[in-house]
Amino acid sequence: MEITASLVKELRERTGAGMMECKKALVENAGDIDAAAEWLRKSGLAKADKKADRVAAEGRIATAQAGGKAVLVEVNSETDFVAKDENFLAFTEVVANAALNSDAADAEALKSVKLDSGETIEERRAAVIAKVGENLQVRRLVRIDSANNVAAYVHGGRIGVLVELKGGDIELARGIAMHIAAMNPPHVKASDVPAEFVAKEKEIELAKMSEKDKAKPAEILEKIISGKISKIVNEVTLYGQPYVLNTDQTVEQAVKAAGAEVIGFQRLAVGEGIEKVVEDYAAEVMKQAGLA
């Protein structure tokens, strides 16, 4: 069968693969466009396997929401350049929407979720890898599903937050989500802070004190330490931090003024916890030349 330009174009539109790859696929499969599409998918999977050991620490946070049900997903690429590629961006939206419409509890479960096209997320990932030429990973998925106010906020594609707020309104929930994106509090309130953390901070503060302060009466010493610990706890709790949208009050004051309560939140930032590999090519060349 003759491999026409229109046939190559049709396969390219269907798969998104490059023109030469589409032509090769059609030649390999005697012009059968369905077989060629499958061949490209398998080729994509092979390429994905070859790139699997490459560090993917860039990427994007995407969200999808329907009422009180919302998700955040982190999809990683190797470079910031690919993180801005239209194929990559489209894939992150596909992943977020698939997560929202499934009951997948985590990124691993999300891999096997089927799309309307019949592909799984994992198969689509492999196809996008074939297009962009980098290792891509669907790394994390978090969700909130509640009858309370739920706000989803993504800042610059790099940081995403979900907030569940009992009472108040969605505007307040969104404001709190923006605060969490900016300030990254580890905990909601003081009672959530682990006792081990507080005990360790007390040790540190005591060690930092001068001998003169340590010689003060026990009750005065306790007040000094308690004041320092209270300040530290405020710094690591959402409720204790000055509200970024109105620094004249804390988040707790803003929430209580609305008769509300923060039930919980989720925050994701691109690449957090991933050790990036920094290549020193000059040192590598010198090493190979026996000069280092």
Swiss-Prot record:
Its keywords, alphabetically, are: Cytoplasm, Elongation factor, Protein biosynthesis
> Would the keyword Methyltransferase turn up in this protein's UniProt record?
no
Note the InterPro entries from the entry: EF-Ts_dimer_sf, Transl_elong_EFTs/EF1B, Transl_elong_EFTs/EF1B_dimer, Transl_elong_Ts_CS, UBA-like_sf
What are the start and end residues of every segment in region (Involved in Mg(2+) ion dislocation from EF-Tu)? 79-82
Q: Gene3D superfamilies this protein is in?
A: 1.10.286.20, DNA helicase RuvA subunit, C-terminal domain (1.10.8.10), Elongation factor Ts, dimerisation domain (3.30.479.20)
Q: Any idea where this protein resides?
A: Cytoplasm
Record's Pfam families? EF_TS
Q: Name one GO molecular function term.
A: translation elongation factor activity
What would be one Gene Ontology cellular-component term for the protein? cytoplasm
Q: Does the keyword Cytoplasm apply?
A: yes
**Family membership noted in the UniProt record:** Belongs to the EF-Ts family.
Its biological purpose is as follows: Associates with the EF-Tu.GDP complex and induces the exchange of GDP to GTP. It remains bound to the aminoacyl-tRNA.EF-Tu.GTP complex up to the GTP hydrolysis stage on the ribosome.
The family database entries (NCBIfam families) matched by this protein are listed as: tsf
Instruction: State the name under which the record lists this protein.
Output: Elongation factor Ts
Q: Which organism is it from?
A: Xanthomonas axonopodis pv. citri (strain 306)
Q: Which gene encodes it?
A: tsf
